[in-house]
Amino acid sequence: MKHFVVIANAYKDRDFALTNKIVAYIEQKGGTAKGLMSNVEAISDNEFELEDIPQDTQCILVLGGDGTLIRAATRVETLEIPLMGVNLGTLGYLCEVEEATVFDAIDSLMADKYMTEDRIMLIGHKRGSETSRVALNDIVIHRKGNLQILSLNVYVNGEFLNNYHADGIIVATPTGSTGYSMSAGGPIVDPKGDMILLTPNNAHNLTSKSIVLSGDDEIEIEILSRREQNDELACVSYDGDTTAELAVGDRFVISRAANHTKICKLHQRSFLEILRKKMGNYS
């Protein structure tokens, strides 16, 4: 591959210092590259647009950390261009390359010495609404405002699964299994898997456990009332970005998205090897 876009976290590559070095390096080797900015906020006036990405782009290099890569992946998901993360942060499961090895990585990419992994994404929408959004890690239904738990009915493919009294419900992809889902007690699974993880967050029940569902399943979450006023409100967060509110009686539908995120890999390291290395740093 010869045609690249470099998306940089504006707070981790200030003044585009590393981005400019990468663009110059690629051009020196006969390729093309364009630098774009990504902000910490998922919605920002300064965030890049799809129109900014040239049609001949073969790879997107994302400078920052897992969060930056996730934001970029969901923003460009319709293009299905492979991404490679360059870790400028701390703990990065998605970012295989570090700043010290980025130019060696570019050499490998330009010599076509790489593989790609397909990662499933989720798509969610409120029942009755035509507005939907995708997530690479997770979609979370969680309480808003007062410190009170939610009452949630969960259905899978139209069949009632369970009622949860909890702070919320985390619906995660295999990629997201090492994120918020793990913190709430969910299982860690191979990120290449085709499954959906359902994990109650702080459930008011001694027996509530995570459930691993098929990637083909459709999950529907209904907001119930626990108060006479029927004034409970819940929020929907996609990969940590809160974008919508749900009221009593609303139903929210989550399923596997049509498109995948393609991650460039340079080494055939097993998921367990990566897990040992990353988790070992924080044990």
Curated annotation (Swiss-Prot):
Entry function: Involved in the regulation of the intracellular balance of NAD and NADP, and is a key enzyme in the biosynthesis of NADP. Catalyzes specifically the phosphorylation on 2'-hydroxyl of the adenosine moiety of NAD to yield NADP.
Reaction equations catalysed: NAD(+) + ATP = ADP + NADP(+) + H(+)
Protein encoded by which gene: nadK
Family of this protein: Belongs to the NAD kinase family.
GO cellular component, one term: cytoplasm
Upper lineage: Bacteria, Bacillati, Bacillota, Clostridia, Lachnospirales
Protein name: NAD kinase
E.C. code: 2.7.1.23
Gene Ontology molecular function terms on file: ATP binding; metal ion binding; NAD binding; NAD+ kinase activity
Record: active site: 66 (proton acceptor)
Key word Cell membrane present: no
Keywords linked to the UniProt accession: ATP-binding, Cytoplasm, Kinase, NAD, NADP, Nucleotide-binding, Transferase
InterPro entries for the chain: ATP-NAD_kinase_N, ATP-NAD_kinase_PpnK-typ_C, NAD/diacylglycerol_kinase_sf, NADK
Species annotation: Agathobacter rectalis (strain ATCC 33656 / DSM 3377 / JCM 17463 / KCTC 5835 / VPI 0990) (Eubacterium rectale)
Cofactor: a divalent metal cation
GO biological process: NAD metabolic process; NADP biosynthetic process
